Design a protein with these regions (language model features):
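Multi-pass membrane proteins that catalyze or facilitate reactions on polyprenyl-/lipid-phosphate substrates
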Residues: 1-106, 113-225
Length: 225
């Protein structure tokens, strides 16, 4: 089982190489598009990405409710049941991996939420989908951190080792707490709360982006766009 899971994780990481493909006519790689969108003065892309996260979660929840029930024998000898598959197949891993790749491109698209939803849409059990999403994210996040530090070191501005370490540690702590929160949401069957949260946040973000576009002013800083 462990060897199979390791193989599925390796397959799930393969789509990340798509991020290094060149985008025709731009002179940039696919991963650079995300940095461009995240650093621009508008937030409408983030708003739509949050709504996409919400839509994926709602679809995943619906698919999970209709997933096949599997029976198993518990340690006490009694028969238990679980909704959805616990084993990943190659197509499942590729689907989740491509979704993770999309989350790396679109700022605002929740990596954990979207990859978990992809697993649910493939008929995977909620807990299994969450565990796979978590483990799949570890090498991806570490690789992103290494690339970010590498790019920062290459910049002419001296950021400082202390500042970089503080940034990495903060990101790791926040990511850990976010995963713990998502695990609690899944174990207490409150995944819909996360879906509604991203829905409301997405709507608010789009409203703010429209107001900023009309006024030409950043609502939070008061500076012109």
């Amino acid at each position: 089982h462990d060897r199979r899971l390791l193989m599925m994780l390796m397959i799930g990481l393969i789509p990340l190489f798509l991020l290094f493909l060149p985008v025709p006519g731009t002179g940039m790689k696919l991963k650079d598009i995300s940095e461009l969108w995240a650093s621009d003065s508008t937030i409408w892309i983030e708003g739509f990405a949050l709504l996409m996260t919400s839509a994926l979660l709602f679809l995943g929840i619906r698919a999970s409710k209709g997933a096949k029930v599997h029976h198993f024998t518990r340690k006490d000898g009694k028969v238990g049941e679980i909704r959805g598959r616990t084993k990943f197949h190659t197509a499942d891993a590729i689907c989740v991996g491509v979704t993770q790749c999309a989350a790396a491109v679109f700022p605002g698209l929740s990596r954990s939420g979207s990859t978990m939803a992809a697993g649910l849409l493939r008929g995977i059990n909620q807990q299994a989908a969450l565990d796979y999403s978590f483990v799949l994210g570890i090498p991806s996040i570490l690789a992103a951190a290494v690339l970010t530090i590498k790019d920062a070191i290459g910049q002419p501005v001296d950021i400082g080792v202390g500042a970089m370490i503080a940034g990495v540690v903060t990101a790791a702590v926040v990511g850990f707490l976010a995963i713990k929160l998502l695990k609690w949401i899944v174990t207490t069957n409150k995944l819909q709360v996360f879906a509604y949260y991203t829905l409301v946040l997405g709507v608010i973000t789009l409203i703010v982006s429209v107001i900023e576009a009309v006024t030409g002013t950043n609502l939070f800083t008061g500076m012109p766009l």
